[in-house]
């Protein structure tokens, strides 16, 4: 289907991986305000900060992450921390602990989890959480109860003395939960762990207006001034929400998939990618949303699959979350049997875009007979993808596509 998203966040000697939220349109604005709006703003700010750090570290590579999954996993992890480690982790995620209690933070994530469970049945989405603990350790009941209450996480005993077998079992667990889309999660991580926390998601989105399958053609994609690659280029000719930004050097469109998802495709002018990325913020998204107009557009977007694995340790340290990776780490609310240390924070995500959508009676249609010349917008050079839940404006996925081939 047109939009397939799989994501994993792994934290070794604790780890995590999480998920997309889709809000029931019938959920009241009051409930959203009470449970989630403050959480969403912190999550979006953290998302853009993390995204900008990753882009700076890999200026010539594709980037694709699920920011809310990272926020979710780290917030869950904070339930097992104490003292400075805990305060640093929550503050690094963007939460003002003087204005919002820790209980309210976890209640906000709990509400998000409920929204996932109650999401539109037209979305194909599988998500969940699991904690794998070495059988020689005793998990504190308070931590077990907290992660069950707020994050619907389960605890599974594992023999980490046999790391090869344990890693295969965890890989198999995640693979089965994500319909085979996330495999070999622990591949290449050969340091035995005693605690592995996993949050997983498989998500398949379907365009409300599909691209024209018969119109997909191989075209040039200009990676940079010296590199040109061939890619299958999809076409949608229809009425689309479009903006040629007067403040930033870019054009953009907003598309929807069935359910509650909104996708922004942003095309910076040549050489202006960093300028646009530097300006990404909640205010920019609000301004773009207000400025979009319904326009007749011939939209060309590459049919693309992007995957990546990111070791987030250095990035999180730069963002102020440093205790997790030092001897100062305090995880005494998980177990008192051992001093847990984090060895890695690894995020894995995959994005697939193709043509298919849902045939809807009375829809605008894929092809229009136009009386005026349409806007022609070709995403044939590096571009940005942002996927939000359009009721809560939580940042689901962020991508920078440098080379789709």
UniProtKB/Swiss-Prot annotation:
Q: Which GO terms describe its cellular component?
A: extracellular space
Q: Where is this site: Conserved cysteine within steroid binding domain?
A: 250
What residue stretch is flagged as signal peptide?
Answer: 1-22
**Matching CDD domains, A to Z?**
serpinA6_CBG
- Entry superkingdom: Eukaryota
Binding-site list for cortisol: 286, 393
The record ties this protein, via SMART domains, to: SERPIN
Work out whether the entry's keyword set contains Glycoprotein: yes
InterPro entries xref list: Serpin_CS (IPR023795), Serpin_dom (IPR023796), Serpin_fam (IPR000215), Serpin_sf (IPR036186), Serpin_sf_1 (IPR042178), Serpin_sf_2 (IPR042185)
Primary location recorded for the protein, binned into one broad class: secreted
Where in the cell is the protein located?
Answer: Secreted
Sorted alphabetically, which SUPFAM superfamilies does this protein's record hold? Serpins
Tell me which UniProt keywords the record has, alphabetically: Glycoprotein, Lipid-binding, Secreted, Signal, Steroid-binding, Transport
- Tell me yes or no: is Glycoprotein among this UniProt entry's keywords: yes
Known glycosylation sites: 26, 31, 96, 260, 330, 369
The written remark on domains in the entry is:
Proteolytic cleavage leads to an important conformation change. This reduces the affinity for steroids.
Q: What exactly does this protein do?
A: Major transport protein for glucocorticoids and progestins in the blood of almost all vertebrate species.
Q: What is this protein called?
A: Corticosteroid-binding globulin
The scientific name of the source species is Pongo abelii (Sumatran orangutan)
What taxonomic classification does the UniProt entry list for its organism?
Eukaryota, Metazoa, Chordata, Craniata, Vertebrata
């Amino acid at each position: 289907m047109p939009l397939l998203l799989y994501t994993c966040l792994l934290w070794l000697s604790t780890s995590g991986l999480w998920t997309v939220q889709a809000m029931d349109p019938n959920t009241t604005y009051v409930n959203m305000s009470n449970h989630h709006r403050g959480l969403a703003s912190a999550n979006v700010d953290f998302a853009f900060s993390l995204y900008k750090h990753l882009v700076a570290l890999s200026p010539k590579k594709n980037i694709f992450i699920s920011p809310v999954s990272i926020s979710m996993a780290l917030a869950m992890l904070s339930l097992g921390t104490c003292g400075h480690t805990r305060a640093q982790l929550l503050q690094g995620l963007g939460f003002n602990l003087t204005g919002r209690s820790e209980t309210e933070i976890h209640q906000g994530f709990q509400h998000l989890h409920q929204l996932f469970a109650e999401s539109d049945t037209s979305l194909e989405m599988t998500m969940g959480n699991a904690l794998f603990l070495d059988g020689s350790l005793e998990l504190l009941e308070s931590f077990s109860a907290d992660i069950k209450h707020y994050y619907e996480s389960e605890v599974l005993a594992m023999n980490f003395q046999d790391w090869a077998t344990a890693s295969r079992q965890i890989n198999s667990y995640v693979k089965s939960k994500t319909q085979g889309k996330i495999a070999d999660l622990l591949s290449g991580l050969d340091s035995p762990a005693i605690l592995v926390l996993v949050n997983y998601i498989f998500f398949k989105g379907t365009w409300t207006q599909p691209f024209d399958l018969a119109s997909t053609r191989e075209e040039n994609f200009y990676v940079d001034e010296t590199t040109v690659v061939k890619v299958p280029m999809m076409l949608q000719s229809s009425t689309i929400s479009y903006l040629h930004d007067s403040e930033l050097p870019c054009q953009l469109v907003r598309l929807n998939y069935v359910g509650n998802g909104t996708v922004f495709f942003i095309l910076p002018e040549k050489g202006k990618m960093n300028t646009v990325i530097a300006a990404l913020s909640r205010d920019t998204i609000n301004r773009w949303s207000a400025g979009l107009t319904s326009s007749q557009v011939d939209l060309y977007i590459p049919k693309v699959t992007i995957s990546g694995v990111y070791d987030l340790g250095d990035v999180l340290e730069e963002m102020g979350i440093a205790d997790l990776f030092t001897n100062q780490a305090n995880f005494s609310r998980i177990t008192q049997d051992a001093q847990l240390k984090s060895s890695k924070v690894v995020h894995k995500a995959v994005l697939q875009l193709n043509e298919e959508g849902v045939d809807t009676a009375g829809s605008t249609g894929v092809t229009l007979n136009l009386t005026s010349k349409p806007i022609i917008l070709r995403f044939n050079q590096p571009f940005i993808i942002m996927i939000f839940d359009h009721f809560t404006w939580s940042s689901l996925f962020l991508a920078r596509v440098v080379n789709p081939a």
